Amino acid sequence: MAVFTPVSLDDLTTWITQFDLGRALAIKGISSGIENSNFFITTERGEYVLTVFEKLTFEQLPFYLNLMRHLAEGGVSVPAPVANRNGSIINALHGKPASIVTKLEGHCQLAPQPVHCAAVGAMLACMHLAAEDFEIRQPNLRGLEWWNEVTPIVMPYLSDSNEQLLATEIISQNAFADSDVFRELPNGPIHADLFRNNVMFEGEQLTGFFDFYFAGCDTWLFDVAVTVNDWCIDDDSGELDQARVRAMLDAYHAIRPFTDAEQGAWQTMLRASALRFWLSRLYDFHMPRDAEMLTPHDPAHFERILRLRIAQTAPALFTTAG
């Protein structure tokens, strides 16, 4: 989240009249993240989140917003899109698509313990199952095809060591994606960006997942790998914290049991997740965009994680007793 397209209170006051939300009372930009322009807004009806989409198009957005609506209606705690009086949940603001969604209660848990990881794992499994019958299909736009597009763009900026790391791993991931094991992996809509700053807690109680704007159809295991690689690590070294990993995986497995194919693909998928975010951070770092309050991320963090996931054996997805 960031602010690329400024929206003033006067802008909001005029625009929001198409909704049954009363008068606009306040608007505040959200600085975290790097993809869209996001704002907390207060109206006579309460607090909401306004997003102006900088890259996603009117044609692409129905997948994301209707997925959120589908999950909310299915009992998964996610922000629900707010429709205007004509029933539209996507509306133009400053010539760009925009939406309003409900605001979750709580705060992000940036120092998670096993209890938090277990809650995230359980809800992630519930989310995957709830989204299984979602009818709209759209690929993960930050999946393998995008990795292949971005690799030659960022390669000239890398050291010899990192150039070799990227070249080797992209070959490995392409081969894996063409394997029988990959084709056996369960798949469907995934969040694809379930970092600590996209989950709300009140104490130890998980109150919801949000920021679904990197969602897409991919393997469920990739979603688990993304989540483990953020929630279950030592923040300085990137090494996996065994207690947090076990808590998350066991809680997920209790609701949506992992398959043998997923067990066999787990190490490779942890690497795939690290590669995806190393590439996106390299791209954003070396191809910066103008924005108010833009917060870039350090690419070296996921380079370290990728090297570790290659060098160290990952904890099993599940034990034979599970």
Swiss-Prot record:
Pathway(s) per entry: Amino-acid biosynthesis; L-threonine biosynthesis; L-threonine from L-aspartate: step 4/5
Annotated GO biological process: threonine biosynthetic process
Source organism superkingdom: Bacteria
Reaction(s) catalysed (UniProt annotation): L-homoserine + ATP = O-phospho-L-homoserine + ADP + H(+)
EC number: 2.7.1.39
GO-annotated molecular function: ATP binding; homoserine kinase activity
Keyword Kinase assigned: yes
Keyword entries, A-Z: Amino-acid biosynthesis, ATP-binding, Kinase, Nucleotide-binding, Threonine biosynthesis, Transferase
Family that this chain belongs to: Belongs to the pseudomonas-type ThrB family.
UniProt-listed HAMAP family: Homoser_kinase_2
Protein name: Homoserine kinase
Name of the coding gene: thrB
